[in-house]
A protein has these predicted regions:
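Acyl-donor binding region in acyl/amide transferases
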Residues: 79-170, 174-175
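Sequence-level motif detector for i,i+2 pairs with an aromatic at +2
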Residues: 2-3, 48-50, 63, 94, ...
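C-terminal "cap" of GNAT-fold acetyltransferases
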Residues: 166-187, 192
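Short amphipathic alpha-helix that is part of the acyltransferase structural core
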Residues: 1-42, 47, 52-62
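N-terminal short leaders/motifs
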Residues: 1-14, 123-131, 178-179
Length: 193
């Protein structure tokens, strides 16, 4: 079965996403310092400013998820929790977003399964970034995941040193136009305004 990301469009789907996040974050990763793991759901203050995406299996269960935080009046996980040179990396808040809570079921963690899954995320994520006028997208990425995303055609750049934030992570940025350049076969007719 080939999995495809879709935009979460119902409370039932969103509840399944929060339960999947709980399973991955709170149970499998053993991250107990998060304040928002309760009642079998993992949520946080950024969810209110997010568009959620998920891939569902044939039984309707979540196999992968992420969110695109946008136009957040409370900032972003990367801006609020990581250090980077804010003079060099000064972003227009009206054009800024952040992909976070990118989780994939262990059954999909082979490169053969990840490629089509993340190609679908590029397609739907790009459409939403263009629709929301997002020119750049932050991410707090672990070193192996940073490398994997670049292999999969997500041209994130490190904007700071490796630092402790729910494990060791780099603050990163991805420009929407560079996502298009890195994937010309997918975005040949796309332009960012």
């Amino acid at each position: 079965m080939s999995y495809q990301f879709i935009e979460v469009s119902s409370k039932e789907q969103l509840d399944k996403v929060f339960a999947f996040r709980y399973e991955i974050v709170c149970e499998k990763l053993g991250v107990n310092e998060l304040d928002y793991c309760e009642s079998g759901r993992e949520t946080d203050e950024y969810d209110a400013y997010s568009v959620h995406f998920a891939a569902f299996d044939e039984a309707g269960e979540v196999a992968a998820c992420t969110r695109l935080i946008h136009h957040s009046p409370i900032g972003y996980p990367t801006t609020n929790n990581m250090e980077y040179d804010t003079v060099t990396w000064n972003f227009d808040q009206d054009s800024l977003g952040e992909f976070s809570r990118i989780f994939v079921s262990p059954k999909l963690r082979s490169i053969e399964k990840l490629k089509p899954l993340f190609n679908s995320l590029k397609t739907i994520g790009n459409a939403k970034m263009v629709d929301l006028n997002i020119s750049y997208t932050l991410g707090s990425l672990e070193k192996p995941f940073f490398r994997l995303l670049r292999i999969l055609g997500f041209p994130y750049q490190r904007i700071g040193d490796l630092q402790s934030y729910v494990g060791l992570r780099y603050p990163c940025i991805m420009y929407t136009d560079e996502l298009h350049s890195a994937n010309p076969e997918m975005f040949k007719d796309t332009s960012v305004t």
